[in-house]
């Protein structure tokens, strides 16, 4: 009798353990901690009107932005998953946040659900679609963002209260989003809506973005339309890429402010551990006194390992008019700069 009871109990425990193991295998959960620590020194001429030079350390990172992030994912079965991402930026020099408003997860903060076939829907603070697509066509792949003009010209870098759908249909990457403005009685004010695509076929990439937002300027919300087109082609270790971006801010008291950015360049993988990048970026602003800015950049990155990179960069900026303006804060005719540093991933 006792043997039969113990046999029954043992069978029940084994069945329960098997069920728990099956549930564990069915619902795999992972949380990854990641980040970047980047320290660089930059020498720049004509940093102020009158020709003064300056040596600085951008503690937010040159080659990559300094960040600390948490990436979580739970397997829900049948190709479905729940996921989240929290990411903040920090100042390497003093350990503080890289923003003055004290936002803890200022870089990214979103949660969503995804499927291998049907794509993902994410909600929260996220990169804009223009940011996602432009990074594919930037010759520097969005390295040196404090120096290059693309992130600040990409229809905003991030959206708050954003609902984004993303999927890959074979060779086509497709994204669409709606950032809620949160203004009572007005669905448009403060809102951003955009759509973007990038098509990849062998060595060729072609993509574009269109977006419209109503941004608060002073006490009024102004319409702001944006579009971008990019193309890239790979020839062995060399990738040639470029694009054009245009933004139309509908100012009420004056002609619209139109900002155009054209860019192009190459990325050459000389060896698996050495990468050369070069590019030219031209920005024109219709109502800016400086009118036009041209930026030429070359860089060399040496990978000590998969996680550690030594980098150097030289850039030259010229202005059509040497006057103080938003486009030309120092009011100089040209500037030359050199940057060196180290970038570590974890």
Regions found by a protein language model. Give the residues of each.
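Transmembrane beta-strands of outer-membrane beta-barrel proteins
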Residues: 31-39, 82-86, 121, 174-176, ...
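Outer-membrane beta-barrel "beta-signal"
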Residues: 302-304, 316, 333-346
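Detector for outer-membrane/organellar transmembrane beta-barrel domains
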Residues: 192-298, 302-303, 316
